[in-house]
């Protein structure tokens, strides 16, 4: 396990830096960000991704089911700005705004969809929070990529550094995690991620079914966040590989999608 997974303030600042350098500039290509912009992040954690948006004057809202993350987010943001709201709840039980004015211009869903069991219902609920002219940014690791199972959260050096182990059959994967003396909570989380695995093909079927339109997408060979984590230079997957279904998942460390409502 890397230090950033235990030092939450460090993790917060890492996300802030990546968001400022990559997410804001990418989103700004498709949606002008102003002091009137309403930005929502679902599964916000401590809210690091939202910092650059708040610094631009956007009104930001973060939702997370983990109370400890929301408590930290409120503490961290108290040092930065006042135009931020954080809510601890199960997003599926959070009521959507009725009026378009109360909905959001930008919604962030980063490293979240791969944890969600009922993805279709989740995306449909998310859709009800998006303004008719808004955009949804979704980022997730393709399931079959070397660390698509999030095994980097393991404490064991073997499990946290060994690629593709999440692709083992369930019984073998579970046994390996136990053999490496991973905590029950970690094993449970990793097996849940395996159950909820998200490939590019699955995600594209889901957004089509939920009637989202793809405005833009990027398949990264070297995830932009790896610049902050590992000092690696971000790199897109060669375009011809984008078109090779199934095989592309093994090389895509991060998938980015800009979506809007199909009727806009």
What residue ranges belong to the model's regions?
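A short beta-strand submotif of the Rossmann-like class I SAM-dependent methyltransferase core
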Residues: 109-112
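S-adenosyl-L-methionine-dependent methyltransferase catalytic module, highlighting the catalytic core
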Residues: 120-125, 135-260
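A generic structural signal for alpha->beta connector loops
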Residues: 57, 81-83, 133, 211-214
């Amino acid at each position: 396990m890397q230090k950033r997974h235990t030092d939450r303030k460090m993790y917060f600042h890492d996300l802030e830096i990546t968001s400022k350098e990559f997410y804001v500039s990418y989103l700004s290509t498709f949606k002008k960000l102003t002091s009137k912009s309403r930005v929502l992040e679902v599964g916000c954690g401590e809210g690091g991704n939202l910092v650059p948006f708040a610094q631009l004057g956007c009104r930001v809202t973060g939702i997370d089911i983990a109370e400890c993350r929301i408590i930290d987010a409120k503490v961290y943001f108290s040092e930065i700005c006042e135009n931020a709201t954080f809510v601890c709840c199960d997003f599926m039980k959070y009521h959507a705004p009725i009026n378009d004015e109360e909905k959001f211009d930008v919604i962030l869903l980063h490293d979240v969809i791969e944890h969600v069991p009922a993805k279709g219902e989740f995306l449909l609920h998310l859709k009800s929070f998006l303004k008719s002219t808004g955009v949804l940014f979704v980022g997730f690791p393709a399931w079959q990529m070397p660390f698509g199972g999030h095994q980097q959260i393991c404490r064991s050096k073997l499990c946290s550094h060994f690629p593709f182990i999440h692709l083992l059959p369930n019984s073998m994967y579970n046994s390996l995690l136990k053999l490496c003396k991973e905590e029950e909570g970690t094993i449970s989380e990793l097996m849940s991620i395996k159950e909820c695995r998200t490939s590019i093909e699955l995600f594209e079927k889901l957004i089509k079914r939920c009637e989202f339109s793809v405005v833009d997408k990027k398949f990264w060979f070297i995830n932009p966040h790896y610049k902050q984590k590992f000092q690696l230079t971000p790199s897109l997957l060669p375009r011809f590989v984008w078109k090779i279904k199934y095989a592309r998942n093994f090389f895509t460390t991060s998938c980015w999608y800009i979506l809007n409502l199909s009727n806009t």
